[in-house]
Amino acid sequence: MAGRELSHLQQLEAESIQIIREVAAEFDNPVMLYSIGKDSSVMLHLARKAFYPGKIPFPLLHVDTGWKFKEMIAFRDAQAKKFGFELLTHINPEGLAQGINPFDHGSAKHTDIMKTQGLKQALNQYGFDAAFGGARRDEEKSRAKERVYSFRDRHHRWDPKNQRPELWRTYNGAVNKGESIRVFPLSNWTELDIWQYIYQENIELVPLYFAAKRQVVERGGQLIMADDERMKLAEGEQIKEEVVRFRTLGCYPLTAAMHSEADSLEKIIEEMLLTRSSERQGRLIDSDQSASMEQKKRQGYF
């Protein structure tokens, strides 16, 4: 009798769990980067499955910037309490002292100091030799050519010309002292796969992903949510109420909402089947300049 064939989502799940287990067994001090978004929520769910009924054997790290949506931080803390995983948080103390923010210093400087440099500080502080990330190859062209095991030098820099072959799902995790690996268990997933898996597994998400009435400002053709009193308005701008949701999450001044009536997982999946635009069109940091994501990754970004 032939064995039961795995569904598409089951194959992706099995591949990701195998990667997570292999890293946990192979590296001395791994960590899972937790950005609180939908991909991080799926990756956390997979990690819990990988080691069930035991606890996740490595910590989760959130690199905060001080500008995340309030609902993201509340969700992060609630998830840590619910599932009992070890949660580490880090915010760049120098950037905090200088008052670095996306309004006064721009997206490029804010992202470099508060995210890239903040991440490198945390990785150095704890001595992590492998860091899981939730990036997928369908998101953006620089990520499309990145390996599952993404080698980083002692300065956490990525060189796209210095990558290792990954034939037949065989991964080379050998690193010298001070070097590290970024690991992407969701590399072969698509945005639609993520949403269908969330629906199948009933995974909790930040409410911002679902359409609701929210206070937004139209700026440069994008809808920016006024999440707190720090929101700075340009001359002529007005806050208005619109029914919107977010396809991707980050710092609220740098993350655009979209008009949508999708207030349930079923409606979001239906919307995904019809959309032809990139989910990262709402990430203002990606529009700094041509190939900006690859340049950020070369400097140590996620």
Swiss-Prot record:
GO biological process: hydrogen sulfide biosynthetic process; sulfate assimilation
UniProt xrefs under CDD domains: Sulfate_adenylyltransferase_2
Swiss-Prot/TrEMBL keywords: ATP-binding, Nucleotide-binding, Nucleotidyltransferase, Transferase
Chain spans, region Disordered: 280-302
Record's catalysed reaction(s): sulfate + ATP + H(+) = adenosine 5'-phosphosulfate + diphosphate
EC number: 2.7.7.4
GO molecular function terms attached to this record: ATP binding; sulfate adenylyltransferase (ATP) activity
Cited InterPro entries: PAPS_reduct_dom, Rossmann-like_a/b/a_fold, SO4_adenylTrfase_ssu, Sulfate_adenylyltrnsfr_sub2
Pfam family, one: PAPS_reduct
Known pathway: Sulfur metabolism; hydrogen sulfide biosynthesis; sulfite from sulfate: step 1/3
Keyword Transcription regulation: no
Domain of life: Bacteria
Function: With CysN forms the ATP sulfurylase (ATPS) that catalyzes the adenylation of sulfate producing adenosine 5'-phosphosulfate (APS) and diphosphate, the first enzymatic step in sulfur assimilation pathway. APS synthesis involves the formation of a high-energy phosphoric-sulfuric acid anhydride bond driven by GTP hydrolysis by CysN coupled to ATP hydrolysis by CysD.
Quaternary organization: Heterodimer composed of CysD, the smaller subunit, and CysN.
Similarity-based family: Belongs to the PAPS reductase family. CysD subfamily.
Protein name: Sulfate adenylyltransferase subunit 2
Protein source organism: Shewanella baltica (strain OS195)
Gene from which this protein is expressed: cysD
